[in-house]
Amino acid sequence: MRKASLSRKTNETSVHLTLELDGEGTSTIETGIGFFDHMLTLLAKHGGINLDLSCDGDLEVDQHHTVEDIGIVLGQTLREALGNKEGITRYANVMSPMDEALSSIAFDISGRSYLVYNVEGLKEKVGTFDTELVQEFFQAFASNAQVTLHINLLYGVNSHHIIESIFKGFGRVIRQGCSIDLNQKGIPSTKGSL
C-alpha cells in the first residue's frame, strides 16, 4: 500500500495530512478556506487518491500561510508515499477543459524541483480566495515533492473555471505519473535513481 501521513506545526499553521495513492478518490478536507477545500476535493477525486487533510491556520492574517503550508506537506507526503519510485510511470501530461477554460498540465517525478506556471488574467479573488495563491501552492508542492510541473493556461475567461481546470488536470497527472507501469522494471531512469 502506497500511503503516507505527515504533520507539520509552525507558529502559523498546524497541518495533518494522510495520502493513499492507490485510492478511490475519497477525501475529508478542512482548511478553513471553502474554495480551496473544493479544489483539493477535485484533486483527490480526479487523482484517484484518498486524502485526509486538516489545517488550522492563521486565517485572521490571510490565507497565504495555510495554502503554502498545505502545498509543502502534500509534496512531502507524496514523495514519501512513492517510496523508491520503482515501477512508476513517472511522466504524465493532460489537457484539462472546464467549460471555456483549457489548461495543459505536464508532470515528471524527476527528483528535481521545478515549476513553470503560465497563467494570466485571473481576477484577484474567487469568493474570498486570493487567486495568486494558486501559484504559491504549486511552487510549494513541486519544491517538496521534488517534481517538475508545468502548468499552462491556453485560454479561459472565468477565474473559477480556470483554477478548477488546473486542479482537475493536476489530479489526473498525479494519477498517471504515480501509476505502476507493469512493463517498467526498476526505477524509470537511466541514472538508476530519482
UniProtKB/Swiss-Prot annotation:
Family indicated by similarity: Belongs to the imidazoleglycerol-phosphate dehydratase family.
GO biological process: L-histidine biosynthetic process
GO CC annotation terms, alphabetical: cytoplasm
Taxonomic source organism: Oceanobacillus iheyensis (strain DSM 14371 / CIP 107618 / JCM 11309 / KCTC 3954 / HTE831)
Catalytic EC class: lyase
Catalysed conversion reaction: D-erythro-1-(imidazol-4-yl)glycerol 3-phosphate = 3-(imidazol-4-yl)-2-oxopropyl phosphate + H2O
Pathways involved: Amino-acid biosynthesis; L-histidine biosynthesis; L-histidine from 5-phospho-alpha-D-ribose 1-diphosphate: step 6/9
Compartments (UniProt record): Cytoplasm
Keywords, alphabetical: Amino-acid biosynthesis, Cytoplasm, Histidine biosynthesis, Lyase
Statement: the UniProt record of this protein carries the keyword Ribonucleoprotein: no
UniProt-listed Pfam families: IGPD (PF00475)
GO molecular function, one term: imidazoleglycerol-phosphate dehydratase activity
EC number: 4.2.1.19
PANTHER family named in the record: IMIDAZOLEGLYCEROL-PHOSPHATE DEHYDRATASE, IMIDAZOLEGLYCEROL-PHOSPHATE DEHYDRATASE HIS7
UniProt-recorded name of the protein: Imidazoleglycerol-phosphate dehydratase
Lyase keyword on record: yes
Main location: cytoplasm
